[in-house]
Amino acid sequence: GCCHIIACRMGCSPCCW
């Protein structure tokens, strides 16, 4: 659950990469 742009930029979510 953290696919938001902020989470992406914080390196939180693999689904964003």
From Swiss-Prot:
Disulfide bond residue pairs: C2-C16, C3-C12, C8-C15
Chief location of this protein within or outside the cell: secreted
Domain of life of the organism encoding this protein: Eukaryota
Localization per record: Secreted
GO cellular component: extracellular region
Endpoints of the signal sequence: none
Membership in a protein family: Belongs to the conotoxin M superfamily.
Protein name, per record: Conotoxin SI.14
Record organism: Conus textile (Cloth-of-gold cone)
